[in-house]
């Protein structure tokens, strides 16, 4: 039995080999490989992820401990928690650093962002500091129309960007009238005369009224025609054109004193009486007519005269009375209003004794002839 038992394994193996050969089936051969390293699998997976997300922008990783509020929300939060609903820039910094330790421990770069958001967003208003309150910097407040800028009072979600459109809601931008609107002026009548010791006739004040209305439009019944005269180039051109159409008839009656009677007839400005310390020079009181020749009409005007009670003109103290000059001849005037003086036949001259004599009078130059009147002014 021992021999049989010893030969049994060989028989069993031989029998197994015979069964395999007789049956014709072969066992499959499987090649076993070692598992790959985990680092290699992660690197391959990372490359695939990079290939898929190659065109996308990489999202900035969130910093640990940073609050989820925007800078606008931080500023609005600090202003809302202040007592006066306004804070300076330093007060905003102080509130943020006390409430959120992240901004206290990190660098100060966020302060630049706070300043930019204050100046670039319309929801914040700069308020100047009052003179009585010492300190540095202006105040910042939240716009009244931007108080509902955040949804349901939450500083995490903000609505559409606020735009300031209506300037009438702010006291600093309120204007009563536009700067380009015409100025409405109403002045009372000047009670006194324009010049001392002289009275102005009513027709003269009525004639100068249209010129003053150019700069002072009438806005109330208090506006009268006796306003101060304001002249410009347009009014003077228009006034000169009206003078060519009709002769001026303005008159001012000066009253020097109660005893002396004087009259002044002219078309221009007014002269006030002046007290001279010298002797008086006599002059004729008769007006000398002279004419203007205009392209379409011929105007007759009277020369301006000023008469005193004793028919003398004021002169210096070292001069002697001079006799009246003869009347001027009627001379034509060119288109620009220049007239050559007439010929004086007898002018008073000084002799060797210092007295005035009527002989050897000097004559003024004769009337210019031809076209020289347009270029040579009267002497």
From Swiss-Prot:
Tell me the superkingdom of the source. Eukaryota
Q: Where is the composition biased (Low complexity)?
A: 251-265
What tissues harbor this protein?
First expressed at late neural tube and early tailbud stages in the hypophyseal placode. Expression continues in the developing pituitary at late tailbud stages. As development progresses, expressed in the mesoderm of the branchial arches. At stage 38, expressed in the developing thyroid and in the pharyngeal endoderm.
User: Where is this protein found?
Assistant: Nucleus
Chief location bin: nucleus
* GO molecular function terms listed in the Swiss-Prot or TrEMBL record: DNA-binding transcription factor activity, RNA polymerase II-specific; RNA polymerase II cis-regulatory region sequence-specific DNA binding; sequence-specific DNA binding
Annotated SMART domains: FH (SM00339)
Name the GO cellular-component terms: nucleus
DNA-binding residues per UniProt?
66-160
Q: Where is this region: Disordered?
A: 1-65, 239-265
Is Transcription regulation given among the entry's keywords?
Answer: yes
Q: Where is the composition biased (Polar residues)?
A: 1-11
The protein's job, in short, is: Transcription factor that binds consensus sites on a variety of gene promoters and activate their transcription.
Q: Which PANTHER family match?
A: FORKHEAD BOX PROTEIN, FORKHEAD BOX PROTEIN E1
Protein name listed in UniProt: Forkhead box protein E1
Q: State the organism named in the record.
A: Xenopus laevis
């Amino acid at each position: 039995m021992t021999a049989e038992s010893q030969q049994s394994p060989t028989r069993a193996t031989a029998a197994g080999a015979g069964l395999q050969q007789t049956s014709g089936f072969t066992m499959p051969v499987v090649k076993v490989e070692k598992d790959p390293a985990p680092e290699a699998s992660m690197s391959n997976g990372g490359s695939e992820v990079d290939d898929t997300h190659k065109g996308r922008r990489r999202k900035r990783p969130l910093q640990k401990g940073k609050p989820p509020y925007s800078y606008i929300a931080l500023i609005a939060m600090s202003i809302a928690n202040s007592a006066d609903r306004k804070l300076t820039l330093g007060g905003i910094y102080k509130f943020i650093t006390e409430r959120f330790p992240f901004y206290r421990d990190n660098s100060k770069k966020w302060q630049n962002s706070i300043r930019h958001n204050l100046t670039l967003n319309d929801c914040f208003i700069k308020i100047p500091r009052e003179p009585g309150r010492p300190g540095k910097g202006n105040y910042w407040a939240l716009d009244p129309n931007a108080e509902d800028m955040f949804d349901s009072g939450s500083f995490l979600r903000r609505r559409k960007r606020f735009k300031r459109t209506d300037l009438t809601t702010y006291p600093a931008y309120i204007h009563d009238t536009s700067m380009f609107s015409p100025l409405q002026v109403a002045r009372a009548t000047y009670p006194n005369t324009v010049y001392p010791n002289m009275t102005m006739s009513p027709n003269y004040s009525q004639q100068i009224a249209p010129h003053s209305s150019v700069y002072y439009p009438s806005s109330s019944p208090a506006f009268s025609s006796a306003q101060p005269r304001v002249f410009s180039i347009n009014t003077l051109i228009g006034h000169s054109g009206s003078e060519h159409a009709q002769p001026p008839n303005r008159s001012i009656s000066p009253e020097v004193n109660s005893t002396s009677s004087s009259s002044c007839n002219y078309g221009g400005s007014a002269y006030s009486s002046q007290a001279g310390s010298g002797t008086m020079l006599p002059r004729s009181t008769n007006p000398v007519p002279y004419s203007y020749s205009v392209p379409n009409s011929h105007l007759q005007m009277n020369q301006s005269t000023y008469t005193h009670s004793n028919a003398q003109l004021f002169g210096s103290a070292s001069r002697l009375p001079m006799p009246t000059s003869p009347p001027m001849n009627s001379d034509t005037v060119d288109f620009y209003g220049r007239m050559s003086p007439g010929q004086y036949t007898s002018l008073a001259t000084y002799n060797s004794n210092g007295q005035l004599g009527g002989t050897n009078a000097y004559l003024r130059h004769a009337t210019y002839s031809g076209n020289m009147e347009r270029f040579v002014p009267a002497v």
